[in-house]
From Swiss-Prot:
First and last residue of the signal peptide: none
Encoding gene (name): ERCC6L2
Segments carrying motif DEAH box: 271-274
Function: Promotes double-strand break (DSB) end-joining and facilitates programmed recombination by controlling how DNA ends are joined in a spatially oriented manner during repair. Also plays a role in DNA repair by restricting DNA end resection in double strand break (DSB) repair. Facilitates replication of complex DNA regions and regulates the maintenance of chromatin structure.
Domain Helicase ATP-binding: 135-320
Stated family: Belongs to the SNF2/RAD54 helicase family.
Protein name: DNA excision repair protein ERCC-6-like 2
Lineage: Eukaryota, Metazoa, Chordata, Craniata, Vertebrata
Cell compartments where the protein resides: Nucleus; Cytoplasm, Cytoskeleton, Microtubule organizing center, Centrosome; Mitochondrion; Chromosome, Centromere
Amino acid sequence: MDQSTPKPHAETNSKDIWHPGERCLAPSPDNEKLCEASIKSITVDENGKSFAVILYSNFQERRVPLKRLQEVKSVKDCSRNFIFDDEDLEKPYFPDRKFPSSAVPFQLSENGDSIPYTINRYLRDYQREGAQFLYGHFIQGRGCILGDDMGLGKTVQVISFLAAVLGKKGTREDIENNMPEFLLRNMKKDPPSTAKKMFLIVAPLSVLYNWKDELDTWGYFRVTILHGNKKDSELIRVKQRKCEIALTTYETLRLCLDELNSLEWSAVIVDEAHRIKNPKARVTEIMKALRCNVRIGLTGTILQNNMKELWCVMDWAVPGLLGSRIHFKKQFSDPVEHGQRHTATKRELATGRKAMQRLARKMSGWFLRRTKTLIKDQLPKKEDRMVYCSLTDFQKAVYQTVLETEDVSLILQSSEPCTCNSGQKRRNCCYKTNSQGETVKTLYFSYLAVLQKVANHVALLQTASTSRQQETLIKRICDQVFSRFPDFVQKSKDAAFETLSDPKYSGKMKVLQQLLNHCRKNKDKVLLFSFSTKLLDVLQQYCMASGLDYRRLDGSTKSEERIKIVKEFNSTQDVNICLVSTMAGGLGLNFVGANVVVLFDPTWNPANDLQAIDRAYRIGQCRDVKVLRLISLGTVEEIMYLRQVYKQQLHCVVVGSENAKRYFEAVQGSKEHQGELFGVYNLFKLRSQGSCLTRDILEREGKVEAGIMTATTWLKEEPPVHKLETAREPDCREHRGPEQLAEAACDLCSDFSEDETASNSVTKTVKNKASDSSRASVSPGQFSLLQCGFSKLFETKCETVEDGDENIASDNESSDEQPTCFSTEAKNAGCQKSQDSLGTLKHQKLANVLNPNGKCVFEKSEKILKENIPSESDDEKNFKNTVDHHHILQNVTESEDSDIIFPTQYTTQRFLKKNIRFKPPVDGSEDSESENPVNIKNNGDDTKTNVRGNGLISKQLNLEIETLKSNTKRKGGSDISDESDDIEVFCKSRVRKQRATSSLRFKRKKENKRELYTFPKTMKKANQQCATDEDCNSQTIDDFSSSDDNLSVGHISFSKQNHRPKTIKDKISVSSKLTNHKRNSTFIPRKPMKFSNESVVNQNRICESMDKFLDGVQEVAYIHSNQNVIGSSKAENHMSRWAARDVFELKQFSQLPANIAVCTSKTHKEKMKGDISTRTKECQPLSEGSISFPLYISHPVSQKKKKVCRIDQTTFIIGETPKGIRRKQFEEMASYFKLSSVKEFAKRVTNATSEERQKMLRDFYTSQYPEVREFFVDSPSECTKSASEKGERVENKSEKRQSLMKEQPSDSETLSFKNSTKKISPIFSPSICKKKSIKFQNHSSCKKKVLSNDVETKKLPISCTQETDGGERSQASEGTAASCSLNSKSGADELGKLENAGKGQQDLTSLGISRNGPIFQVENKTIENPVLEDTSVVGLLGDTSILDDLFKSHENSPTQLPKKVLSGSIEKAKQRPKDFWDILNDQNDDSLSKLTDLAVIETLCEKVPFAASSKRKEDLEASLWKSNEKFLWKKFNSSDTDESTANTQE
């Protein structure tokens, strides 16, 4: 029934005679309920039945039989006790709201207590659950805490509980029951027989009357307020039990404690229970003195500062639940807080997490908390950003002057030993007070307030109405400070109003001035919060001076005036700004008309700021809300914000039982761990040079998270056999230099340098440029959070193309001299670290990422390009290629400082749309002046352009391309979901992390979409363009989404070298200096990047956004999103699990830093070794298809093919089949080959040879599509080898590689890249290349530099080989993981082809090509003979494999000295220091004479990467010099080496 329509009273019998115009009760046309209407006319039908035409109140007419009409009875004739029907008097009554649920009571117990249906129909499920929780504890006579987030309706839940307990019905019955007894007797109705219950509700005064209003709204409660003048009379009524609920304040409770204790309360309900947080406070003592067992606390922030507060609140509600305070501190508080340190050891972290879980279990039955995620679907989007504003020069001078005062010096030295040698601290001995007699503690708070004022606006120091206590102090400070600035003093005297409102005296005011102008243009309505009313005065005067129509609300505003202000602001368009005091406007106000919230200054308590934000961000808000928190850079305000983060993270751990991210080294209250946050030295300090402590801390955590997440995903990607050596994780990092390893070993605990952080974050353009050179000093290869996109800190869902465009641009922007795709690629290759190159995107798989020096030769096939993108111009295609590649590499090469990098889940479709064939340069150069020409050919016109660029660029490009190709291969076999097929490069990072994250936007895109397609003809032009964009957009923030799972942000690492301008044509040939193995690969991506008109429109919108606007504000130094700073992360979850396992289960690594991932127990490793050994013996030919574990293939894949072919209207995608289709086709294959189950078919595939698998694929696919038979054409017969021989050779190579890995920790990088290059060497016949068959043997295990052709080598024991290989892969993880996966659709198919082509490759590798050997120029349609060129190298140098130990280490180095090229076609690699090979290849006496210089020799040897231990390092150096005894010409016996390798491995 429509509740808004009262039900008139009618007689039981209908009236006999009706007349037109009479009032009557007629059935409603909507629901047939009787409602009042009038008779318009009366008619009789042909059957003699009488009908009345009824006119309803809504002017509807209806023909109704007269018999159905009833007479309206006057109210005066009704009996006294039936004045209204139940439905008329129901509470709550919301006429404009529909009932969310059915009108039935909610049973709380079997004895009949229930929430009345009048209330229940408006409740949400979680609110019913909360009422049930309260009722359960009430019945059992014990207390509890309801800790729901703000805005979830704790008040309504309590009222529902009270209604159930008090037996309320929400109808007329409650009215009658509330009547005095004498009236009930007159009505001949017995009073209720149930015992009367009384409840006491204690609330802050600010919400006391709000409770009264809510109780009156939701039910018929007899409520009295014990406060103010009437509290004595009301107290008498309470003693007479004439009320059911008594409302009072904390202060009144203190005054009337004895009277209230004399009463018997059914329960005490305390709102804002976090006020009971200090055990020594008077309010806590009063609350604990209340005589009531059922104590119910309501608080959304039970822990605001430290865990002691939590204990205090819980101990009040449930005395003794958490033990004594000392017990709680020892068992819970200390372990949790110390385990939350960024530098915590595994034991500290594991102990802290275990204590967290124990605490959660203890509190679970007594504490109920839900968060706003329950109602997120009813809330709009919220963007929360921290805006760091630079101080003006005047502010800096004043701030520094305050810090240099004698009083501040007294504060800073107060904890030092007294000069009188008494052994006491200065503040307790001779320096208790200053010259004015003020104690150090008083000075501490006074000067802290002064610094806060200066950080906001210098004019605040001269404002009147200062408290008497500080008046003298402030005057003295002003005299001392402003004595240096007489102009300011004089001006403020002459024109105080102008001075206060002039933004030039405040960096924040400058930002606010432009922000308000921007909001006024966009018709945004702004809520401007400030904690200080004096600051509100300044802001008010500024609004007056600017002619802004504003409203102001603070503590002095009367309650009725508040309602008027809120209504005017929400409804009036002209009023677009409201100045609100943070404390006064924090509760009970509904500013849903505002869509921009500006917090001008932070508070120490995060709850205050959150309450202020919730004034606009709440149910009822229709627009997306933007929250901007202004922070003065480098001042005490930054410490205030970071302490908020510290407290919120601690709250997440203790209250939310989350593995909260560990940002800080500090522990509150600990003298030993004051870290970055606590102690007077952190507060009374001005960070200069524009450095941002917040950025440093967030980036530090981000780098650790990136390493951990890549380590985690790597371990997932690797089959368990590969995890056998995971405990040797330092070996994984040995490929980095000693500095990097030391940094990783200390868990990245130290703050990074300002230069480094400047380049890691999105700062202003000037800072970025300044940091470019310093960035190169960072050891390459370590990746930050941004590059892998793992931390919730900065990233979110990647949705729009426009973000991708921006990231592309930001990539270009990030290197001053390399705007093309080489910039990022080069960086990664220059890293030359297995882990680092590995630590690419989360979306990539780990193929040959570990191959830092690999020669990847990318072959572009014109034919394939035409098939894939026939309609696009060459320029467009080329731009897409470079852009797509650039996108991926942006993330791959993110940061050079990450902790552990093991990438996984790489994808490829966004890679180069055109196959670009890259040849690594022959030499590297450390000298930025020396350049190597990079041959870039355009297939279309056969023009060849020499591009000047650092070898590091080309080398990294090779590495990255190799990585992506092998990642593509990896993808085939591992069951990565289809979502990972697309590399989400459109990272919406709101964090202004590195210049990569700055998401440089192509501004020209707005005017001409074509420019996005057209890549600059020369790199120089691109540099100019990027520089322009960088200047304008270095701080642009992308749209942010608060998703925790979709995290990927680009991060650019910078190089010291000046990257020369490059020209990009359709075909790019890049050379890189390599070791013996060379690889050839041709790669075709699935998807080009699309720049649509829609993306241009979106781009235009973003350009007009507030983010774009803020980016152009000069005073904005840094912006980061606050969206995902608070809370846990997947990386932290992994670290916590690993720590708990290592400490409590495996009893190992307990003192290692928790941020180091050491995995897998020894017993597990031995078990897995045994399993693998047994299985490999069974599957004697180590075929690529043999799969030992779900999702993974146990042995290296010899090759993987990625290909897209189009025949007529059908497109065949080879090697990139989506996961779901692969699974389906695998099942179809099982049926096709008449096998009983998929498992049986899998075993058959596992045991089959390469030819057999290829035949199976051919038979299956040709049965459905005969035209694909041509895809299975074998390579020339002379190259054919049996699959089993291939498999054995893979084992040998794996074993040799393993031995090298064990002896030489740093060799894994060089070998890994050699692995890729060997397999990609251009050995294939031209005919194969022309057919676009993508051939590369991705033997990730073939890291051995010299692979003999002897048959004996091929016949080594498989089990032994696999064992060594497994251990090797676990460390390096390079190509193995990627090569380990075989696409069930195309893996075997391509395997056969490439194995046939492998014989020539084997001949090539058996020659032992040196790392400096010439690189072969391979054109698109002409293949030079690499064997001939290789022979020339052998003729010059002979078998150089014996020097592998000596020269391997320098492949890890980021740079190379220049050296001469042996032939014109050879190109140099740069960014790598010179080693012996470089000197030998320099055919001049000067270079060779360097070998006689002992200093040069020592320098070369010192560049060996820091090993996992000093012992390993000594062994390494010893092996280097011992290897020289054999020198160049001694032949290498592969079988002997394999045996020695195995022994070394043992």
